[in-house]
Swiss-Prot record:
The protein, known as: Forkhead box protein N5
Residue ranges of DNA binding: 178-275
Keyword annotations: DNA-binding, Nucleus, Transcription, Transcription regulation
Cross-referenced InterPro entries: Fork_head_dom, FOX_transcription_regulators, WH-like_DNA-bd_sf, WH_DNA-bd_sf
Organism of derivation: Xenopus laevis (African clawed frog)
Coiled coil ranges: none
Region (Disordered): 119-146
Cellular location(s): Nucleus
Claim: Nucleotide-binding is one of the keywords in the record: no
Pfam families to which the protein is assigned, alphabetical: Forkhead (PF00250)
Family matches, as SMART domains: FH
Keyword Signal: no
Length: 295
């Protein structure tokens, strides 16, 4: 039985103490079920419980050979008050964080102190130089290195330098247009412009990056798409030759199939003038466009 109280302190002292000591245990022991299990409103089942009681008393060890009941010397107490948090502690209760200590200073004064501290930290972070000229000026004026000085200035400079490189890379990415070709056409272009018509995967990567600078800064996910097209497209097949890559690993060579050559030629001739203009802008050497694409 679990009891819930608004104020638990007076009842916490009752842990492991007995209650309801005037309960008639001699009558309780004669029952087949305890009184707390005999729910109210079950008068229709009284006869069945009475039969159980009679049967249990006939087999009771307290019954003597003459048929009279012996007085039971056992006087247990059925009601024991326990604190379940102490008897069976829950992990959440054990690992519960203790309450924070009460604040001695007034809340208004504490809020003012915190606001001053936060404003100081934010102002110190905003003091970092935001332009390249400011960064170069700070580095030029710092002629001597003092190990006693805090390193926040150097960390800011390093972070700003990295941020500027990322912005520069994004600018270069925007300056080069993405070629209006699918990955099968890019692979076919690389294979048909090789010396013997065969390349491994790394050589295909190098060809695409060299002639289309967009893929130099693009995320490396495009490489997975290239490998996927090599394995599952009917335009390519593995060659019988092998090449030793870096680390003396043998890498298989890929070549165009007859269907792949015909598909590439038809799709290139089907490009519109606008797409050809975008394709020329995306190439590092647009003068080689007619030679590379066979136009």
């Amino acid at each position: 039985m679990y009891l819930r109280f608004a104020n638990r302190k007076p009842y916490e002292k009752l842990h492991l103490s007995t209650a309801l000591e005037d309960w008639d245990m001699s009558e309780e022991l004669k029952l087949s079920i305890t009184a707390d299990q005999y729910f109210a409103g079950a008068d229709d089942k009284v006869e069945r419980y009475t039969l159980r009681r009679q049967h249990s008393t006939e087999l009771s060890p307290t019954r003597s050979e003459e048929g009279d009941f012996q007085e039971c010397k056992f006087r247990p107490s059925l009601w024991l008050v326990v604190d379940p948090n102490l008897v069976i502690p829950c992990p959440e209760w054990i690992n519960r964080i203790p309450p924070a200590p009460e604040l001695t200073s007034p809340p208004l004064q504490l809020q003012r102190q915190l606001s001053v501290e936060y404003s100081t930290v934010e102002d110190s972070e905003d003091e970092a130089p935001t332009s390249c000229s400011d960064l170069m000026t700070d580095d030029d004026n710092d002629d001597s290195y003092n190990p006693c000085q805090p390193k926040n200035k150097h960390k800011r400079a390093k972070c700003l330098g990295k941020k500027m490189r990322v912005q520069k890379g994004l600018t270069e990415l925007e300056s080069w247009a993405r070629p209006p070709l699918n990955y099968c056409n890019l692979i076919s272009l690389a294979l048909r412009n090789s010396e013997d018509g065969c390349l491994n995967v790394q050589q295909i990567y190098s060809f695409v990056r060299d002639h289309f600078p967009f893929f130099r800064i693009a995320p490396d996910g495009w490489k997975n798409t290239v490998r996927h097209n090599l394995c599952f497209s009917s335009s390519f097949e593995k060659s019988s030759g092998w090449v030793c890559a870096d680390g003396h690993r043998r890498s298989c060579l890929w070549k165009l199939t007859r269907q792949g050559r015909r598909k590439f030629r038809n799709e290139m001739h089907a490009l519109s003038d606008d797409l050809l203009h975008v394709l020329r802008r995306s190439m590092k050497k647009p003068a080689l466009m007619e030679l590379m694409f066979g136009m």
